[in-house]
Design a protein with these regions (language model features):
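Solvent-exposed loop/turn and edge beta-strand elements of beta-rich ligand-binding domains
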Residues: 1-174
């Protein structure tokens, strides 16, 4: 039986050279380990790191350092701050939108008791399988103020669970 122990490192620079700085979340280093029994002399094993990345600046590069142990003795280590195969980049979710008339799809909404605007929201860097809610509010382009009907803002909301990190979803305003 073998144990893989890993630590997450922040790739930084000192004097123009890349250096490793241990990643800490809530004052604790981000570490993980996995125990496995190999079926062959060569193979792979996964080590899953779970941590809150909300406070990590987008664009930050994180590098995994790992050691292989058996019976408490270190047999091998991989600690290369420049290894692209051990590097991930923190990304932030992003959205862009495109609104259209809900009746005929053009950019003109006819004055009507039941006007509808559909906003197609293109999203990037979401977590597949996690539920998200998009909330929208129509604004007057000329004033920048929220559009109100009967004294209430015109809003739309859609809850969805993406299958992929990037995609599109629609929010309907009525």
């Amino acid at each position: 039986e073998y144990t893989l122990k890993g630590s997450m490192q922040v790739k930084a620079e000192k004097d123009g050279k890349p250096v490793a700085k241990p990643l800490e979340v809530d004052g604790e280093p981000v570490e993980a380990e996995a125990t496995f029994t190999p079926e062959k002399s060569d193979g792979t094993a996964n080590v899953a790191f779970r941590f809150n990345s909300r406070d990590i600046k987008p664009g930050t590069e994180l590098v995994v350092f790992e050691s292989l142990e058996r019976g408490g003795n270190q047999l091998a280590a991989h600690e290369d701050i420049e290894d692209v195969n051990q590097t991930v980049t923190v990304t932030a979710p992003a959205i862009s939108t495109s609104a259209r008339d809900g009746i005929d799809g053009d950019k003109d909404v006819v004055v009507d008791d039941e006007a509808t605007v559909i906003d197609t929201v293109e999203y990037k860097n979401l977590v597949p399988g996690k539920e998200y809610t998009l909330n929208g509010k129509l604004h007057s382009k000329s004033t920048g103020e929220p559009l109100k009907v009967g004294g209430k803002p015109v809003t739309g909301q859609t809850t969805f669970t993406p299958e992929k990190a990037d995609g599109k979803v629609e929010v309907t305003f009525t």
